Amino acid sequence: MGSKRPDRRGFIKSGAALAGGLTFGAAAPAIGQDQEHHGPSMIKEGKDQIAYGDRSKHVTSVRIAHGGRPSPDNWGLTFHIAAPLQDSVGVITPSSLHYIGTTRGSFLPDIDPKEHRLMIHGLVDRPLTFTMDDLKRLPSVTRLHFIECAGNRSSRRAKNVQETHGMTSCAEWTGVLLSTLLKECGLKGSATWFVAEGSEEVKGASSMPIAKAMEDCLIAYGMNGEAVRPQQGFPLRLMVPGFEGIFHTKWLRRIKVVDRYYINYNDFGHLDQDAKVAALDYQIGPKSVITFPSAGQQLPGKGFYEISGLAWSGGGAIKLVEISTDGGKRWNKAEIKGTAQRMAHARFGLMWNWDGKETELLSRCTDEIGQIQPSREQIAKYWNKPYDQTFSVPGLDNSIQPWKIASDGSVTNGFA
């Protein structure tokens, strides 16, 4: 079966990690007083490093172009860029590694925050225009939220978790609730939808229900303790917690309140959809993925490991994560690290004693409203499609991702 699940208390009592229980080798002995020990070489810091810190040269995690398009391309357009989930720790994605999503491709706007304005108009009593200073004078909130691109799905060609699931990230966002601004403007009785527009060349815009705006949408000017990065929408980004990434409008400049579903570029593809597809086009379903061990990684030998990964859902907080170490025959409850936040990544882990045999790892999650992450077989049944056609189903794909572990410790995509 490829594994034994250790008792947590027994694992600690056995002192496996300190007594050579990790069969690929015990920790090196401490250096004795009679042994010569040389400290590390010193880094000579310059003014740039003092002004804004660098990471260590030994840390090499980088984003990669996603979906087969070079980015930037020969014209300088940026397309999809995936985050290195395989190297992530905790739940917050560093701003410099946060994924980038743009279906059409975009040039990066160079916006002077002193000149930037946010206009709110349409079916409101008082159309208003806000400067950045105006927004920062209003009551602020700080919340942890993920964003995920609708194209974040596995394929048989994907070689690692960055290629299968790298189009999601989680950050701490600070700003003003959209409901605060809409209350200031005053909504007319016929207001049922709103349209958010960005400042990029094609004026990216999306239509959303006004109920969502009044619930938890955030006009963010801060990200991970500093200003929102230009690639993430500086100086303003609309955060729509739990909705697919295309609704999180970057370089936000205008919100129009309307009384019907508004036709624009981003929403045009939704017009022909039946209810079954449309239901999957806003809220992200429960989803999880094991980031270690995952495809492209190598286990050095049998013994104890902590299986680790991320889970998230547009339906709220993650309440349960389960892991199978035998291809789905049995499921074990994983530990959720810390307190899971609503519409945010949750880090999970499970101690595992690998016996060195070939096996398959899976994870699945359940959110606070009871939604359970489906298998690919369940996806096929839902769409009434053959299994082989489920990799291109409409809407969002939140199916379980398998990782195969060979007897030599190599890890590969279970769909390959």
Pin down the residues of each PLM region.
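N-terminal secretory signal peptides
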Residues: M1-G10, G20, F24, I31-Q33
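Generic cytosolic/nucleocytoplasmic N-terminal low-complexity/intrinsically disordered segments
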Residues: S3, I12, I43-G46
